[in-house]
């Protein structure tokens, strides 16, 4: 992966065609994310805790949009992000970003129609749920119960991505589940910051003195 990254960086630097440079930059981002995934695979089983903090979902959504919207546009498919939770969550931004990237990439490769990433309040009001769905054929009924097991895949892939995403969600105190298999709807459940502790509400705007 290091050699591939160096080659992509070289192409991005020496190419005079904007389209080639843009494609090289996109590929480089994918390689960097894959490197992170491999690293997580090596140590996720050793980590029992995660450095979580108060983050805004829109920050994670904006990063995901920047990474994926061009690829969805090239495929002629809409990618929609909607934050109706409108409150900070307690999560690890890097891990949450990788979980969403796995779900979005799978939707792009194997799904169809509009891919929607929707954050909303959980039923308990103490958490936030992020749903990733599309309008494709979905997941075979026989695979659904074991979809997060390593090696389980209905599309000839390694079957590592969803298993890792499941572990990453757990590592930051969240939960990744398959809500429905047809149409495919995955949910990521995360603890929300109570309104009484929300720094945007507790701390007044402007200077303190």
Name every feature range the model reports, one short phrase each.
Residues 47-51, 88-91:
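Conserved micro-motifs of the catalytic ATP-binding
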Residues 73, 78-88:
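Conserved catalytic submotifs in the C-terminal HATPase_c
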Residues 106-108:
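Short helix-loop "hinge" at the ATP-lid/N-box region of the Bergerat-fold HATPase_c
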Residues 114-126:
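Short beta-strand/loop element within the Bergerat-fold HATPase_c
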Residues 134:
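Acidic ATP/Mg2+-coordinating residue in the GHKL
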Residues 139-151, 203-204:
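Short conserved segment of the HATPase_c
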């Amino acid at each position: 992966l290091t050699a591939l990254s160096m080659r992509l960086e070289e192409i991005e630097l020496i190419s005079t065609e904007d389209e080639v440079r843009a494609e090289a930059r996109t590929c480089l981002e994918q390689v960097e994310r894959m490197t992170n995934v491999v690293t997580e695979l090596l140590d996720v089983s050793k980590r029992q805790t995660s450095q979580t903090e108060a983050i805004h979902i829109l920050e994670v959504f904006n990063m995901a949009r920047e990474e994926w919207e061009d690829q969805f546009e090239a495929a002629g498919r809409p990618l929609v992000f909607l934050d109706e939770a409108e409150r900070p969550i307690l999560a690890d931004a890097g891990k949450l970003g990788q979980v969403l990237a796995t779900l979005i990439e799978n939707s792009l490769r194997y799904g169809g129609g509009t891919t929607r990433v929707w954050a909303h309040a959980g039923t308990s009001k103490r958490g936030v749920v992020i749903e990733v769905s599309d309008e494709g054929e979905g997941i075979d009924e026989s695979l659904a119960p074991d979809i997060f097991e390593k090696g389980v895949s209905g599309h000839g892939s390694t079957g590592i991505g969803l298993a890792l995403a499941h572990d990453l969600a757990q590592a930051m105190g969240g939960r990744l589940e398959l809500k429905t298999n047809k149409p495919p709807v995955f949910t990521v459940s995360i603890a929300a910051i109570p309104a009484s502790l929300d720094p945007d509400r507790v701390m007044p705007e402007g200077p303190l003195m």
